[in-house]
Design a protein with these regions (language model features):
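Catalytic cores of nucleotide-sugar-dependent glycosyltransferases that transfer UDP/GDP/TDP-activated
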Residues: 1-504
């Protein structure tokens, strides 16, 4: 029984016999937080969600009214037996990923879900304050490893200890204070390098001073706001790869074709503003490196009047971003010419990722600094690629199919030929746990509302009978979850008072 079925049954019972007075008792609250009920023999099991992302399982005996707690696995087994009468498998794999998160800091308040970066900045600043010497050593090592294609950034090998860093910070700030605020890095590079500092602190002496003072403040008295500002000024991303294998990915003539819609527009807009942001940040930090963005998708020989058969395509409105297309191949190595549904592409993704890796390394001349996956297939490809290249991985789901199809996990076998949910849900589970951070558009996407389950939350506990059951698949309190709303294109949406930009 679903939440609505349980609520309707309670309402009907109260309508028929209002004398019981259950309307104003704790039992009504119990019914309201019941998400699901299963009936097995004389027992009725309930999955309770008393508040956002909090779950409990209990069961009642219909004759004795005895109530007791149920284990997650036990509740899932009852569901399995309802789908397959008499089914019993004591050896079905169970997945509980809780132990893998024990050593990592976790959020505790449901209102904080999706604010992972803010939480980690607070946690890190607290650690820097509590373990002063260890934290300062960590910051020093962090700054020492920064480089781009062999070019050192931030610090050179003249600074080897924290005490030396303190001394050189004072000297560098004293020196920069004597220079005009608009003096460029190129004009002060030699003396700054003699102190142990490389490019990356700012383009002008004023910007360099601001960044150096932020570092001094962080070293002296760590504060999460100063730490966030300082980290935001450090150049870390010079090149990135965006993966979106399915559909017809192109800049024109693709919308309306199978598996092709809003995700394409989202990524193309994202690329334009990501490149601009990357360029501006690098420029302001005094680094003359052109950022590179590669959108990696599938090459489709039967392109149906689109550019999806072109291996390389520049993205309009960008300085240097490109679409890189890699074909799907069968086990014999032959290119698959026709479009393939997003539900049927799973056998091709591993070979696609290996081929994409070679092309990406050739174009970029090295590893990217960040890999962003999109949708289930792109996120799995991002997982495979990031593990091979040892690069930070970001996931963007766009839509998780599990919540779009009612009981798609429980009845996966019925839909397997058409949708291959067994592969997709497994890919989702792997990718979301492997990701370094996950971007969601809204809080509801992660943890739902007080009355509905979130898309990611639906992966916490579920079963696919005769395949495997998940006791704890993902922790929505993990700080890897971050909410970043898509926003709006300022070239399209602007104040009505800006009349010169309006169409005549």
């Amino acid at each position: 029984l679903l939440k609505t079925d349980i609520g309707d049954a309670f309402a009907e019972f109260y309508r028929r016999d209002p004398e019981h007075g259950l309307e104003h008792t704790p039992f009504k609250g119990f019914i309201q937080c019941s998400q699901e009920a299963v009936v097995h023999g004389s027992w009725i099991g309930f999955a309770l969600r008393p508040k956002t992302a909090a779950w409990n399982y209990v069961r009642f005996h219909s004759e004795s009214a005895h109530c007791e707690a149920m284990g997650v696995s036990e509740f899932l087994q009852v569901k399995e037996r309802l789908v397959h009468t008499g089914y019993q498998d004591d050896w079905i794999p169970e997945f509980d990923l809780t132990p893998f998160n024990r050593e990592f800091p976790q959020l505790t308040e449901s209102r904080s879900i999706g604010r992972g970066v803010e939480f980690l900045n607070r946690h890190l600043s607290s650690q820097l304050f509590t373990h002063r010497n260890q934290g300062q050593q960590f910051l020093l090592r962090f700054l020492q490893v920064h480089q781009s294609r062999g070019r050192p950034l931030m610090l050179n090998d003249r600074i080897q200890t924290v005490s030396h860093l303190y001394a050189m910070l004072d000297k560098a700030q004293d020196f920069l204070s004597t220079q005009p605020g608009g003096t460029l890095w190129t004009e002060v590079a030699h003396p700054m390098q003699s102190y142990g500092f490389e490019a990356g602190w700012g383009r002008t002496t004023q910007q360099m001073l601001e960044t150096l003072r932020l570092l001094s403040d962080v070293l002296e008295a760590p504060d999460h706001e100063n730490l966030a500002h300082f980290l935001g000024r450090i150049p870390m991303i010079f090149s990135l790869v965006i993966l979106s294998p399915h559909g017809y990915f192109g800049q024109s003539g693709v919308l309306g074709k199978p598996d092709t819609g809003g995700q394409v527009i989202y990524i193309l807009d994202q690329v334009k503003y990501l490149e601009k942001e990357m360029h501006d940040r690098l420029w302001n930090q005094g680094i003359d490196i052109e950022p590179q963005i590669l959108v990696t998708t599938r090459l489709i020989p039967e392109a149906r009047d689109t550019a999806c058969d072109q291996p390389l395509e520049s993205i309009a409105g960008t300085r240097n971003a490109k679409i890189v297309r890699i074909p799907f191949r069968n086990p014999a190595g032959e290119i698959i010419p026709q479009w393939i549904s997003r539900f049927h592409l799973w056998p091709y993704l591993e070979r696609f990722t290996l081929d994409a890796e070679k092309e990406i390394l050739a174009i970029l001349g090295g590893r990217p600094d960040l890999i962003i996956g999109n949708y289930s297939d792109g996120n799995l490809a991002a997982t495979l690629l990031s593990r091979r290249l040892k690069v930070t991985q970001c996931n963007i789901a766009h839509a998780l199919e599990k919540t779009k199809y009612l009981y798609s996990d429980l009845y996966w076998e019925t839909n397997e030929e058409q949708y291959h949910f067994s592969s997709q849900f497994t890919a989702d589970l792997i990718a979301m746990n492997a990701a370094d951070f996950i971007l969601a558009s809204t809080y509801q996407e992660i943890a739902g509302t007080p009355y509905s389950v979130g898309q990611y939350e639906s992966y916490v506990t579920f079963t696919m009978p005769r395949l495997y059951r998940v006791i704890n698949g993902i922790n929505v309190f993990d700080p890897k979850f971050n909410i970043v709303s898509p926003g709006a294109d300022p070239d399209v949406y602007f104040p009505y008072t800006d009349t010169p930009r309006r169409l005549k």
